[in-house]
Amino acid sequence: KARFVEMFGNPVLNDRGWKQVPLGVVTTKIGSGATPKGGKGAYQESGVTLIRSMNVHNGRFEYKELAHISDEQARKLDNVVMEEKDVLLNITGASVARSCIVPTEILPARVNQHVCIIRCKECIIPEFLNKLLIDDNYQKLLWSIAGSGATREAITKQQVEKLQIILPPVKLQNKYIEFCNQIDKSKVAVQKALDEAQLLFDSLMQ
């Protein structure tokens, strides 16, 4: 998070003077779905994945309680067919403003009415947009938008489209994402070493 601010500044104040555009300009799709008829009773053990707000956490996807629907139900949600690298944003409820990228392995998938799909054009990298949306400053902005409407804790499609997004050069966006990936690899390596040390310790104690 500190690296984001270090490289790009505050994305809300845009104190680095980057080009700024409404999110609707740099995306090919913004939209949310619906809950299939029958609600929870319509969910299945397998089939097409239905992403709900409980699955979307900041920077990570939660697989617990992942719902599935039939092909017939999925066809009724063909306006929200997920694609690889789509950015997810919770737009209603207590988890409003949480955002992550859809994992490829759960596709084919749809979203319900509480989750918004954001599909990026080539000028903005999905991973960069996700990091921007979950930046502390941007989270505060999203919460204030969600709390200002007639319906509490909700962000409309129109409000998502109008969100002002900083647009640094793609090369710089890529550089930042490469840095994040290296950090993630380091974390995995450290955890593996800790696990191995614990196993060794446990075997010595026996």
What residues fall within each predicted segment?
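Sequence-specific dsDNA recognition surfaces
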Residues: 24-40, 54-84
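Non-catalytic DNA-recognition/assembly elements of restriction-modification systems
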Residues: 1-34, 162, 166-174, 181-206
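Short, ligand-facing micro-motifs at secondary-structure edges
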Residues: 57-68, 87-111, 127-131, 140-146, ...
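Short loop segments at secondary-structure junctions
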Residues: 120-124, 137
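A short glycine-rich beta-alpha junction/loop motif
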Residues: 108-116, 124-127, 147-174
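Cleft-lining beta-strand/loop regions that shape enzyme active-site pockets
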Residues: 51
